Swiss-Prot record:
It comes from Solibacter usitatus (strain Ellin6076). Belongs to the UPF0173 family. GO terms for molecular function: hydrolase activity. This is UPF0173 metal-dependent hydrolase Acid_3917. Signal peptide: none annotated. Keywords: Hydrolase. The lineage of its organism: Bacteria, Pseudomonadati, Acidobacteriota, Terriglobia, Bryobacterales. SUPFAM superfamilies: Metallo-hydrolase/oxidoreductase.
Length: 230
């Protein structure tokens, strides 16, 4: 599978079959979005919560590519009101197959208000995702969150081999909390996200790497716009 970090909390996953998933799309106005990078296909969008830096380009991409859009029930309803045709609403603990990927929605510790024309709309709750790939490998995409003890249940239930965790601090957990998340999840690799986009997001991969020294988890720091194979 090809993974491309598109800056901040946005990722593109391209499966061997060709299915393309975009996680938490924020392109327009994203200072970390790689210059010259173009999205040419989207089959699936997964949205962890309704904040602008995770949902901003969901509607434009949906109208351009007509993908299936996975989100918690209330956020999916809001997207429908904006003209998104193919929503796949769900809630925590539920699973559904989207293309070739079985998607399970998990808990997250964060807020989820959607700013719409100057008002904050209730968007349900923030969530994470477990992605069960066709080759039986498992990804955990936490979305924005703090560490929570039930990450141990995510490990127990799903055994993710690759985890995507925010480390920026201020609006999410910092490397200090993310290090505990690594210990609870026991994934082989962790890809840090949601850091460095703005000056207050001070967490850095090297700090996380130092804090989990001795743990059998590799901190895999990606470069925006540069695809990697996993």
């Amino acid at each position: 599978m090809e993974i491309t970090w598109l800056g901040h909390g946005t990722f593109q996953f391209r499966l061997p079959s060709g299915q393309v998933l975009v996680m938490d799309p924020w392109i327009d106005g994203n200072p970390a979005y790689p210059k010259g990078c173009k999205i040419d296909r989207v089959d699936t969008i997964c949205i962890s919560h309704g904040h602008f830096d995770h949902i901003h380009d969901a509607v434009p991409l949906a109208k351009q590519f007509d993908p299936e859009v996975v989100a918690i029930f209330e956020t999916a309803h809001w997207l429908e009101s904006k003209g998104v045709a193919k929503t796949r609403p769900m809630n925590k603990g539920g699973s559904q197959k989207v293309g070739e990927v079985m998607v399970t929605m998990t808990h997250a510790v964060h807020s989820c208000g959607i700013v719409d024309e100057g008002k904050i709309i209730y968007g349900g709750e923030a969530a994470g995702y477990v992605l069960h790939l066709p080759d039986k490998r498992v990804i955990y995409f936490s979305g924005d969150t703090n560490v929570f003890s039930d990450m141990a249940l995510i490990e127990q239930l799903y055994h993710p081999e690759l985890a995507f965790l925010p480390i920026g601090d201020l609006y999410t957990m910092s490397p200090h909390e993310a290090a505990l998340a690594c210990r609870l999840l026991r994934a082989r690799k962790v890809i840090p996200m949601h850091f460095g986009t703005f000056p207050p997001l001070t967490g850095r991969p090297d700090d996380l790497r130092e804090r989990i020294r001795g743990l059998e988890t590799e901190v895999w720091a990606l470069e925006p716009g540069k695809p990697v194979q996993w």
